[in-house]
A protein has these predicted regions:
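A short, acidic, amphipathic alpha-helical segment used as a generic capping/interface helix at domain edges
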Residues: 91-97
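Short S/T/G/P-rich N-terminal loop/turn motif that feeds into the first structured element of a domain
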Residues: 2-71, 78-88, 101-156
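Short intrinsically disordered, low-complexity coil segments enriched in acidic
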Residues: 1-2, 96
Length: 156
């Protein structure tokens, strides 16, 4: 009888689901007369998310190269819990309300597998959301507490 153990899987080979990282792309279109005010609101929301959401690993606001009124929030979440926190974070709730006044389109795509409960909670927002569940692959995303994160940020 062998006492050998199976080799440990590398940490980036994690099962996909509620505890795995995922990508969210939110596309929004701004009313032309509201562009300056919208940009200020988006920047305030971005800074607040950075200060309050440890589970948000990547958060950028990107302008479409062909339409100066179309923007994309590119977001990477640590897990489902990070998204659920994001959805109830007061600065984000305020920004979503502001988008309702200053924007005229908002749609979301999620790349990665979320739990059924998370999808139900997120879909209850009424925003059009398309879910792309993971079939296979891996993630090397590190959390802020990892050694690599400190190296990337210039903090040994």
């Amino acid at each position: 009888m062998s006492t050998a153990t199976a080799p440990k899987k590398p940490e980036h080979e994690i099962p996909f689901g509620a505890d795995s990282p995922f990508i969210l792309i939110a596309r929004c279109h701004v009313k032309e007369e509201c562009l300056d005010e919208y940009m200020k609101a988006a920047e305030i929301a971005d800074k607040a998310v950075m200060a309050t959401e440890d589970g948000m690993l990547h958060h950028t606001f990107d302008q479409d190269p062909d339409d100066p009124l179309m923007f994309t929030w590119s977001e990477v979440y640590k897990n489902d819990a990070a998204l659920l926190f994001h959805l109830t974070n007061p600065p984000l709730v305020k920004f979503v309300e502001q988008h309702g006044e200053m924007g005229d389109k908002f749609e979301i795509e999620v790349y990665g597998t979320l739990s059924v409960e998370t999808k139900e909670a997120f879909s209850a927002s009424g925003i059009p959301i398309k879910y792309f569940d993971t079939k296979f692959g891996y993630s090397r995303i590190k959390t802020r507490k990892s050694k690599m994160w400190g190296v990337l940020c210039g903090k040994p």
